[in-house]
Amino acid sequence: VHLTDAEKAALSGLWGKANADAVGAEALGRLLVVYPWTQRFFEHFGDLSSASAVMGNPKVKAHGKKVLHAFADGLKHLDNLKGTFSALSELHCDKLHVDPENFRLLGNMLVLVLSHDLGKDFTPAAQAAFQKVVAGVASALAHKYH
């Protein structure tokens, strides 16, 4: 992912303000509610029968936290996202058979939730930087599929 120094500074500054655990839980929960076909990968999480069930599900929250910590690791390795996410790409492709389009959808949910979480600090320029990163992460996660 090619980012300017200003974009890198914006990412770093804003990421420090975000509540990563809550953002991860909210982003994954929204993915499962807005795109219900993604729930098939999480049937073992228990009750996903309604928006409130999904958003209150402790397994969804825990996995969202895990996802966001992986994303945070990617922020530390922006010059090598494919390498950073190679094991997760292989897992999601070979074992879990996740449609790689879901990575893009989750990235969009992440940007949406960050926008809400960070409020006015999440400027259009900051959004553009985060969109670049989530697109890069989605591409890295889909790498094994090609």
From Swiss-Prot:
Family matches, as Gene3D superfamilies: Globins
Modification type S-nitrosocysteine: residues: 93
Keywords: Acetylation, Heme, Iron, Metal-binding, Oxygen transport, S-nitrosylation, Transport
Biological-process GO terms, alphabetical: hydrogen peroxide catabolic process
Keyword Chaperone carried by entry: no
Record keyword Cell wall biogenesis/degradation present: no
Domain of life, source organism: Eukaryota
One Gene Ontology MF term: organic acid binding
N6-acetyllysine: residues carrying this PTM: 59, 82, 144
Tissue specificity: Red blood cells.
Pfam family, one: Globin
Domain Globin: 2-146
Residues with N-acetylvaline modification: 1
UniProt: heme b binding residues: 63, 92
SUPFAM superfamilies in the record: Globin-like
Function comment: Involved in oxygen transport from the lung to the various peripheral tissues.
Assembly and interaction partners: Heterotetramer of two alpha chains and two beta chains.
Family note: Belongs to the globin family.
Protein name according to UniProt: Hemoglobin subunit beta
